[in-house]
Amino acid sequence: MEGKIVIVTGASHGIGLATVNLLLAAGASVFGVDLAPTPPSVTSEKFKFLQLNICDKDAPAKIVLGSKDAFGSDRIDALLNVAGISDYFQTALTFEDDVWDSVIDVNLAAQVRLMREVLKVMKVQKSGSIVNVVSKLALSGACGGVAYVASKHALLGVTKNTAWMFKDDGIRCNAVAPGSTDTNIRNTTDATKIDYDAFTRAMPVIGVHCNLQTGEGMMSPEPAAQAIFFLASDLSKGMNGVVIPVDNAWSVI
């Protein structure tokens, strides 16, 4: 990734921040985006940051222009869509309209709008890698809320469609599907909105794959970040339209 220009959403914490650190260590120039402030732990001159809401309709244009201004180049070698929010385990019976709308907007619509803007650049340069962070729940349906599951299934579909549609333009599009990971999503959940009946039914399964029995707990963000880095780089040059689970074997059951 030496000399590459990479855009990372959700860059202030969790998997996004872990990915930023890997990219910078490999010599990439990274344009980070997040609703939260710039991560104070990142001090590299190769890291530039834009704080905004990716759901704003003008956000994609601002992000692409911001990267161009920051690094003095029209190139975008990789787009890593890491940002995401949860839905409090609300089911098809209990979901609230505002929660549904927010989750679909952040986890799907905003990601696809940014892809559209970045694809304009990648199509001209005839190269580029897009990595979308979906979830173990993109590979199944249980153990999550209906909006979150729907958004991640849809984003995986977008990933596969984009991979095929733009393969002849030198553009790859792949996905990483993390399992239970210790990220900021868990720390910012509004407990008053949780569907505790659904949550209670899911916990026995979630607990096994969070390693609660061993006391090890959730995975750190680094394993998912390493998979994202791999798919963004030329190490995965022959891979297009794939999804890599990083979930302690959860997706095999």
Curated annotation (Swiss-Prot):
Disulfide bonds: none
One Gene Ontology CC term in the entry: membrane
GO biological process, one term: terpenoid biosynthetic process
GO molecular function: oxidoreductase activity
E.C. numbers: 1.1.1.-
Binding site for NADP(+): 8, 116, 148, 152, 184
PANTHER family in the record: DEHYDROGENASES, SHORT CHAIN, ESTRADIOL 17-BETA-DEHYDROGENASE 8-RELATED
Function: Short chain dehydrogenase; part of the gene cluster that mediates the biosynthesis of pleuromutilin, a tricyclic diterpene showing antibacterial properties. The geranylgeranyl diphosphate (GGPP) synthase ple4 catalyzes the first step in pleuromutilin biosynthesis. GGPP is then substrate of the premutilin synthase (PS) ple3 to yield premutilin. Premutilin synthase is a bifunctional enzyme composed of the fusion of a class II diterpene cyclase (DTC) and a class I diterpene synthase (DTS), with the corresponding domains and active sites containing characteristic aspartate-rich motifs.
Family under the similarity heading: Belongs to the short-chain dehydrogenases/reductases (SDR) family.
Name of the protein in question: Short chain dehydrogenase ple7
